[in-house]
Amino acid sequence: MWAWCLMPNHVHLIVVPADTDGLRRALAGVHRRYAGIIHARRRRTGHFWQGRFGAVAMDEAHLAAALRDVSLNPARARLVVRAPDWRWSSTRAHLTGKDDGITGRAPIRERFPGFAQLLAAQPDADAFARLRAAESIGRPLGDDRFLARIERATKRRLTPRKRGPKPRTEADANDEGQLSVLSP
């Protein structure tokens, strides 16, 4: 787990699963156990987390925006004045370099050796908006090369297609008005 933040009504995670089913396997069990504990304490049932589970595959360029979002979320929500003061987050581990038993610090340290400067930098509103949009529609976030690589790996088209009806082809025009007869 590269980064995380447990908020009162939701959780943010930046994880890189080892295989295609790794994320589901890891989170399903955690969700069941944690929700079960809280429901038992509060003697309630029903949905536990706010909204649905959202996941965004992203390239390295968008990782910085995601890290800022996850790390600064408690301060933006006015739960603390400074993000490192929030106990239920990986932010402190990344800033101090101390092991918290949860956070994989090395991948972030390698990519962002100036983690404090990353958090202090002016927020990129466009990157944040792209991150939220990608999360809401479930599409990967990255440049054309990244998207092409993901499309090849998954054998699925991931880039949005043009809206509206498909353009007519010459074959469609030739078929128009012809009646097909099937005989037994």
PLM region descriptions:
Residues 1-7, 16-184:
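Short Pro-Cys-Gly-centered "Cys-loop" motif that presents a nucleophilic cysteine in a tight turn
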